[in-house]
Every structure is written in C-alpha cells, then in structure tokens.
Amino acid sequence: MELKGKRFLVIGGAGLIGSHTIDQLLKEDVAEIRIYDNFCRGNEENLANALKDQRVNIFELGGEVIHRDILSTAMKGMDGVFHFAALWLLHCWEYPRSAFEVNIAGTFNVLEAMVENRVKRLVYSSSASVYGNAVEEPMQEDHPFNNTNFYGATKIAGEQMCRALYHRYINTDRSFDYVGLRYMNVYGARQDYRGAYIAVIMKILDNLEKGKPPIVYGDGSQAYDFINVIDCGLANVSAMKANASDSFYNVGTGVRTTIKDLAEMILEITESRMKIQYESGGMTFVKNRIGCPAKAEK
C-alpha cells in the first residue's frame, strides 16, 4: 500500500510495539494516525513525542476491541489497520476466558469492522509463540505449531481468522489484504516488565542498577532470538507498504542467544562485578526459539 495521504488506525497504539510503530509511521507522509487503546498496558507517556504531531490523535470514545460498535466507529474512513491489542502471555495463562474474549473474539471484531468499513489492509500482530519449542532451528514460517499455552493458541486462532475471512471476501467489494508478523523475543525502551517471563534484558539491567545480581533460572541454557522493538516498528510499516498478502513472516534476527550468554554479555558491557545468581524454578513456557528471518528479508 502506498502510505502517502493515507489514514491508519493503530489498535493498541499506546503499547510497546504499537507506540514504536507510530514513531516509524510518522516518518512517512501519512494523513492521520488514530490510536485506539484502553491504556491497560500502554500509557500516554509512550506517545509523548508522537502526540506533538497534529496527524496523531487518540480516539476518545473508547479503546476496547470487545466493544464492536465503538470499534467500528473508530475505523470509519481508515485506509489501513495495525492490530496490536491482546492480553499478554501470563494474563492468558491466568485468565483464559478473558484471553478468549480479547485475543480471539476481539480479533474477529477487528476483522468484522474492517469488512463493514471497507478498510483495505491489515497488519496483524502475531507471535513466535505459535511455534512453541523449536522442533528445528532456525524456525521457518512452515515450522509446525508446537505451541502448548493459551496465548499461543489465541495467536494461531487470530492468524486463521485473518486467512479465512480474507478468502471469504476476496473478489468482492469487501475484500481486504493482510499480513501477519510473528515477533521473536522483543526488547527495548518502553517495555513493561512486570511479568515473570518477559523482558529478561530489562530485568537484568534493573537488578544491576539496584546493586543486585542478575537472576537466571535453571542452568541458563534456554535460547532465544532477541529483536529490538525499533526493528519491529520498522517491520510493521514495511508490512503495511508491501504488496504481499495472505502470508505470515518472522520478525527476528536469527541469532541464537542463551540466557546465560546474555547475562554474561550484559555484565561485560556494564563492567559489573556481579556474578550470575542461578535459581531453580521460574515459569518458562519455551526453552528454545530462534526464527529464520529470510522470508521477511525478501
């Protein structure tokens, strides 16, 4: 899609990936960026710079994806939609019913509102959680869905709804294009790291700032693909620009980093004399997840 003069709705725009996507979108000659957010996880501080631009506004009537009529109203006149709103991994673990209503039914509501309003393109925020533990590394997009947690299940459902409704309305006046992005382990500025399983980089830095050692659960052999949120924002804007449709892409570096190596790297960079503190337990949903970025790079 040509972005010049276009209007975009960013659902979940006050969150980590959403706010960085807005920052990148503002570098384009777009006409309007409308933010639809309930500010449950996101906050206006994340939007401080973006809101200085007159092209950016927060939709004032609400920001819940479960409110179908308000969501549809927010989508009127939009050319494209970025959909980031979702309950995070641990909330899905603790509250699966709410996760179903927000992540699955909410995504259906987004798609339904797009069809009603003839919005032409969607960038859907999926997740590497659809893969679960890697059967083979690096994981390509045709890697089997090895997921065993409810968050991953909601993202698989979201992908399949995008595909099903795309094919239902193709070659009609309600047709739309979409792409889904499967982010690897995202880190960076504005990250909310209250959850026990996320934001390991920020938690290590936070401990060091407090004079505490970095904590690593188990032996630290868990390995992930870490991607900076700025790169995720760039990927989202590129996905909106692209001609590709009805497809999913990994967003990662393809670099395998163990938690032990990561902690040692941070200690070296910060010139800290702290030693890694190994602890048993800790909630770990996957132990190895490294994506292949080749398809997205093309």
Task: Enumerate the predicted regions with their spans.
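Active-site loop immediately N-terminal to the catalytic Tyr-X3-Lys motif
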Residues: 96, 147, 193-194, 243
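Residue-level signal for the nucleotide or nucleotide-sugar donor/cofactor binding architecture
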Residues: 42, 66, 94, 102-105, ...
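A conserved pocket-lining segment of Rossmann-fold NAD(P)-dependent short-chain dehydrogenase/reductase
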Residues: 92-93, 173, 178, 182-193, ...
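Short beta-loop-alpha junction of Rossmann-like oxidoreductase domains
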Residues: 133-135, 189-191, 287
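C-terminal substrate-binding subdomain of Rossmann-fold SDR/epimerase-dehydratase oxidoreductases
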Residues: 28, 208-298
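N-terminal Rossmann-like NAD(P)+-binding domain of SDR-like oxidoreductases, especially those catalyzing
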Residues: 1-184
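Short glycine/proline- and charge-enriched loop/turn segments
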Residues: 137-146, 187, 199, 278, ...
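Hydrophobic alpha-helix immediately C-terminal to the catalytic Tyr-X-X-X-Lys motif of short-chain
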Residues: 157, 161, 165, 200, ...
